[in-house]
Amino acid sequence: GDCSCEGQICKCGYRVSPGKSGCACTCRNAK
């Protein structure tokens, strides 16, 4: 799923924790 990171959409983002809001962007091979 997509994740909002610093106002940008990170397709390969993921949630930090099931009970926490926010996300971590570790995008690899992003196009």
Swiss-Prot record:
It comes from the Eukaryota. Contains 5 disulfide bonds. Signal peptide: none annotated. GO terms for cellular component: extracellular region. It is found in: Secreted. Expressed by the venom duct. One of its GO terms (molecular function) is toxin activity. The keyword DNA damage does not apply. Keywords: Disulfide bond, Secreted, Toxin. The cysteine framework is VIII (C-C-C-C-C-C-C-C-C-C). Belongs to the conotoxin S superfamily. This is Conotoxin.
